Amino acid sequence: KLDSALNIANKALEADSTNIMFQYAKSTILLNTGHYDECIKLCQKLIEKDDSLAEAYYNIGLAYFNQAIELDKVQQKSRDKRKRIMTLYKESLPYLEKYRLLAPEQKAQWVSPLYTIYLNLNMGKEFDEIDKIKNEYRNNHR
């Protein structure tokens, strides 16, 4: 289904290559199909055109975050792999923090990734803050 969605997005972009909504849709499909590098490049182009596009920051942040999570699931973690995971979390961080600033009402989307990043990067003050927000959110949405 996602392949056909990608085909539709590509056809829409053939008709109107400058349409931001079509480009954003394609970036989301790329994110959901694990084409992280392509997603990042497309979203960076979107941000260059309009740096207030919250969802573009979210997609880039999740592209880096998802790569870190996938690497973290591997049983045998070498020192190099652990370093790569930390690098991916660090690359994800500014995009997810920017998304949080641009879309504060979207807690369901940014709270868990930021929680995980702050925890793994040992960011005590930020972790304490996000832990409180996460607990409040969870208590209000039961």
List each language-model region with its residue ranges.
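Short coil/turn linking the two alpha-helices of tandem helical-hairpin repeats
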Residues: 32-34, 61, 66-77, 120-124
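Short coil/linker segments at helix-helix boundaries
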Residues: 65-98
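TPR alpha-solenoid repeat register
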Residues: 22, 56, 109-110
